[in-house]
Amino acid sequence: MNTPMPSSTDDLIEALAEIEHEQWRHWSQAVAPKVGTGISDGWRKSWVNYAELTEELKEADRVWARKVFALLRERRLIE
């Protein structure tokens, strides 16, 4: 992932969402052999780069990105 430094809150949320998706993809691929094929088959369609996700799936990652953003702001690590 070669994301440029975010220049706004929205850019930061989007960058965090991309990282969240990458983390989920690595985790889900690692545990896929241990879960039922019905579950992992459903995940496979999301094993793509963040930019290739549907807006609905991107928004699911943004939900978690906003939680990280809120924590960073609460701890005064960002303004």
Predicted feature locations:
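Alpha-helical propensity feature that highlights long, continuous alpha-helices across diverse contexts
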Residues: M1-E79
